[in-house]
Amino acid sequence: WSDPEFAAEVGWKGDPVATPNLDRFAREATVLTEAVSNFPVSSPHRGMLLSGMYPERNGVVLNCMSERPESSLREDAECIGDVFSAAGYDCAYIGKLHADFPTKNNPQRPGTYVSDAVPEWDAYTPPERRHGLNYWYSYGTYDVHKHPHYWDTDGNRHDVDEWSPRHEVSKAIEYIE
């Protein structure tokens, strides 16, 4: 759980809340009671989750921003999406990426950053840098969660007037269906 306050609020831990799927998962799987990131910084941690490699190997050694082009997920890094896609799975990425440095590659305004307000942080990830993830609905680091924006698979920008976690869950359900 990302918030330790709510970690005990599941049925299998005795809480009265109904969590039948999590309860079944806890019975049938291994429950880890503690986890530690060996690099608890946004971009490097995301790079490790995607690639299974330490930051020094995957290229994401610092938080990704335009002033740090050396910190970005290597194009030749084999990531989980590459592996699953090569095995025939349909792969999606929905939400914040923050593992690729921003460049002047705005699909709607070529030669410009995607954000005039925060060009050093926000990013559009072109298809060749998506590591086997064929369905795309993501952004770099635009943390206005009540009014987020995303780029879809084709590079179209979507400005949303909905809390980002709720919207991303809706997009995930839409993708799965």
Task: Please state what every model-predicted region is.
Residues W1-E177:
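Formylglycine-dependent sulfatase
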